[in-house]
């Protein structure tokens, strides 16, 4: 319903006096705002500076991430400014944190270019994090409308098609990162790839910082690595892969490396998060056109995702990367050496794998999300995991995951192939126990010990790593706890 003449006159008189007017009075706060299906929604954790009203702080975030500047500008009158202003519509105190608040903000869809993560992020995180009115600010979650998601390609391959190409079903996929990640020659690198795949892994991979250094140029690595893949595939009768990292200093170099991957016949290639949103989308489009599985290493994410009060929650990165077109993304292990609270990791995996997610505050999901027709993205678990944790990994992470045992393969006392075999046997015995209806979580250690009686490599691995864990407190944990009456 259109506003009355009196209402428009009042708004003009209130908002368009020269000078500085509080953001809330400028129209960036509306407690009665009715959310539209086409709105982009964002929820920020904000810590206002001392003396700053939380509502005004939320309005300032809405303003500075949409149309506002620090003073009244008359050119607002030349636009549909009331439509284009983002609306902060809700502010809640954070449980157990007296100085923190959750601010909910709605953005008109027309504020964003279709299919452009760069444009979306330029608004949502482009300027507000340096705003003096906030002592700290963190983007916790977003809701993308279906109309907006339809402008993005989504994963280049998706979980279902990836399994069809690999002909592997009913279990997690197994991988490992070549170690040491820097310093090997091409020939030795290819030997590691062969040993790991021959021993039973589905994938080997480059690490985030192996590109084209003086000790091993990229083409040398690709050729020797692919020789290892082909020999292992021929010897095992299984489809195998190696994630060749095509990350480079320019898009031209990345496309050259990607085309060479296609030429030599690999099923998968890899990029790093640090190449940027536009480059990631570009490679996602290339991968879809060229039937290539695209793995993303989340290199650099902890610089802004790990701290609880400032930066960005990793679940937002998961959403953006599913939109951008990657097929794999590292998303936590729960039991490994890297940051990963169980509830938070569950939220990340659901974000990547579910067709729809509902509000689940315990897992950190503040909005319901319909993923429209975007394919599923395969989570990857890596960092400090070993075969003795197999029952825990399957319990926490399920089947649609790549379990990557780098040190847990290449650090095996009997060699790389034995390390791979230990992981494959541990996985298969645990999946069989689960499928038979056994209590594999509690019986897991016994199941592994029984399997080890007929598998020397598994016995050696269990003897070496025993029950090694990395029991450090997570810095990013749930703000809400599940109670007996929750979700009723």
Swiss-Prot record:
GO terms for molecular function: magnesium ion binding; monooxygenase activity; ribulose-bisphosphate carboxylase activity. The record marks 337 as: Transition state stabilizer. The keyword Metal-binding applies. Substrate binds at residues 127, 177, 181, 298, 330, 382. The modification N6-carboxylysine is found at residue 205. One of its GO terms (cellular component) is chloroplast. PROSITE patterns: RUBISCO_LARGE. Keywords: Calvin cycle, Carbon dioxide fixation, Chloroplast, Lyase, Magnesium, Metal-binding, Monooxygenase, Oxidoreductase, Photorespiration, Photosynthesis, Plastid. The active site is at residues 179, 297. Binds 1 Mg(2+) ion per subunit. The basic functional RuBisCO is composed of a large chain homodimer in a 'head-to-tail' conformation. In form I RuBisCO this homodimer is arranged in a barrel-like tetramer with the small subunits forming a tetrameric 'cap' on each end of the 'barrel'. Heterohexadecamer of 8 large chains and 8 small chains. Belongs to the RuBisCO large chain family. Type I subfamily. This is Ribulose bisphosphate carboxylase large chain. It comes from Rhodomonas salina.
């Amino acid at each position: 319903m259109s506003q009355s003449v009196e209402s428009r006159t009042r708004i003009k008189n209130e908002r368009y006096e020269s000078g500085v007017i509080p953001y809330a009075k400028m129209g960036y706060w509306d407690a009665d705002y009715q959310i539209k299906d086409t709105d982009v929604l964002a929820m920020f954790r904000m810590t206002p500076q001392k003396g700053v009203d939380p509502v005004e702080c939320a309005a300032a975030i809405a303003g500075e991430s949409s149309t506002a500047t620090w003073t009244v500008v008359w050119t607002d009158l030349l636009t549909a400014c009331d439509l284009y202003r983002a609306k902060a519509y809700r502010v809640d105190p954070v449980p157990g944190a007296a100085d923190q608040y959750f601010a909910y903000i709605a953005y008109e869809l027309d504020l964003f270019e279709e299919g452009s993560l760069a444009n979306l992020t330029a608004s949502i995180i482009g300027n507000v994090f340096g705003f003096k009115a906030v002592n700290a600010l963190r983007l916790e979650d977003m809701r993308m409308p279906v109309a907006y998601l339809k402008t993005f390609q989504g994963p280049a391959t998706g979980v279902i098609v990836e399994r069809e190409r690999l002909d592997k079903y009913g279990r997690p996929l197994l991988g490992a990162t070549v170690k040491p990640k820097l310093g090997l020659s091409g020939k030795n690198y290819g030997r590691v790839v062969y040993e790991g795949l021959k021993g039973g892994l589905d994938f080997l991979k480059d690490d985030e910082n192996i590109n084209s250094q003086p000790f091993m140029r990229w083409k040398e690595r690709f050729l020797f690595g692919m020789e290892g893949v082909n020999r292992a595939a021929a010897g095992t009768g299984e489809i195998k892969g190696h994630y060749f990292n095509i990350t480079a200093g320019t898009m031209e170099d990345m496309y050259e490396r990607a085309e060479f991957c296609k030429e030599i016949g690999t099923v998968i290639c890899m990029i790093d998060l640090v190449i940027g949103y536009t480059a990631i989308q570009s490679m996602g489009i290339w991968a879809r056109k060229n039937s290539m599985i695209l793995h993303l290493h989340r290199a650099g994410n902890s610089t802004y995702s790990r701290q609880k009060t400032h930066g960005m929650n990793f679940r937002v990165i998961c959403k953006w990367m599913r939109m951008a077109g990657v097929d794999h993304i590292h998303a936590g292990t729960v039991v490994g050496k890297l940051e990963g609270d169980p509830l938070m990791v569950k939220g990340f995996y659901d974000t990547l794998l579910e067709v729809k997610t509902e509000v689940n505050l315990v897992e950190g999901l503040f909005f319901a999300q319909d993923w429209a027709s975007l394919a599923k993205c395969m989570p990857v678990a890596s960092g400090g995991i070993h075969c003795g944790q197999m029952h825990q990994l399957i319990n926490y992470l399920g089947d649609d995951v790549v379990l990557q045992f780098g040190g847990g393969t290449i650090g095996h006392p009997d060699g790389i192939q034995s390390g791979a075999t230990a992981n494959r046997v541990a996985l298969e015995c645990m999946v069989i126990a689960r499928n038979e209806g056994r209590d594999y979580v509690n019986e897991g250690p016994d199941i592994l010990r029984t399997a080890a009686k007929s598998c020397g490599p598994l016995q050696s691995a269990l003897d070496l790593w025993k029950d090694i864990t990395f029991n450090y407190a997570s810095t990013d944990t749930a703000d809400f706890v599940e109670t007996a009456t929750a979700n009723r």
